[in-house]
Curated annotation (Swiss-Prot):
The keyword Magnesium applies. Signal peptide: none annotated. The gene is emp-7. It comes from Neurospora crassa (strain ATCC 24698 / 74-OR23-1A / CBS 708.71 / DSM 1257 / FGSC 987). This is Enolase. It is found in: Cytoplasm. Its cofactor is Mg(2+).
Amino acid sequence: MPISKIHARYVYDSRGNPTVEVDVVTELGLHRAIVPSGASTGQHEACELRDGDKTKWGGKGVLKAVQNVNEVIGPALIKENIDVKDQSKVDKFLIDLDGTPNKTKLGANAILGVSLAVAKAGAAEKGVPLYAHISDLAGTKKPYVLPVPFMNVLNGGSHAGGRLAFQEFMIVPSAAPTFSEALRQGAEVYQILKSLAKKKYGQSAGNVGDEGGVAPDIQNPEEALDLITEAIEKAGYTGQVKIAMDVASSEFYKEDVKKYDLDFKNPESDPSKWLTYEELANLYSELCKKYPIVSIEDPFAEDDWEAWSYFYKTQDIQIVADDLTVTNPLRIKKAIELKAANALLLKVNQIGTLTESIQAAKDSYADGWGVMVSHRSGETEDVTIADIVVGIRSGQIKTGAPARSERLAKLNQILRIEEELADNAIFAGEKFRKAVEL
């Protein structure tokens, strides 16, 4: 069934910045996708095309990307008349049309919008839900696997004020029997955490960050972990709800001296207190002994390969590569060869097409890695990643706290999928790292 129209416009993301929305129209109707954007962006990821016109949106406009869809990609793709069900052919056409290694010419935000909208058109043409179409494209086995939600309940780093260097503290309800129960446990812990934060740090500590987590004025990781552990205990889930961290350590790496500054938000930070990677690795090991931590993302800077390999040898927890790999096949290959991590953070907008995202997941699975599908800090009401996480059978999703509609939209979509699949789906639970093998 041919595409009759492709139209892009700009809409706003959850931070009030413009982003790209794409409509693909076929005989079966309109299929729409909106592209997210990140705050801490890795330097090796696909190019998010921004206008750079400081007089509008502080330079963050996407009029050029929108124009590229409407004047270049749209007409060319319609003329090519590719079957919308043939996602890899569509995506290859988009990649070739751009012709640059990281989509700088047309913009990954323009290309991804079209890629995801086409996937929705393909699902409609097959008369199946999007997750089922993605499952076919990825060639994953059945039953479907519903993911463990990694919920970012406490923020630090560049996502929050306060002196806390680590960016995200997540709760992981992996001992729950079903996805809906996991979400309930997470929501209950979150509510308790919020009231504890207000009690200990004042009313404003209940204010939420970009991803819905609270951001009290916390000084160090132990303080954050104690607060979360207390919330888990008060909710009655000790031993059931685990903890994960996204350190986002590239944000506080001092490249010139190869050290990590845990007081990086303080302009008067004392260089004698900066840590070598061995000292930072030691801190993580101590935290893992003291708290129920099951996963650490970006423990070291994106080009500090030596540190990653060193830490990997000492740990059996999940070590998630995000800034290190930025969903880029070449970086993933290097990380696997150097034994730097054991899980991939999959962000579709870091690579720019659905086909490449599926391939990145498959490459990771092939080497025994886990895959965590992720939102970005600038999100929208688009729920495509919920269908992706079920379709590629990855068993883990990170999409913020159970707060703010752009975060809940994804979790609510998984609730709907759970209801629809009933006995045809299993919950990843404690086996989230190897969900693809379940």
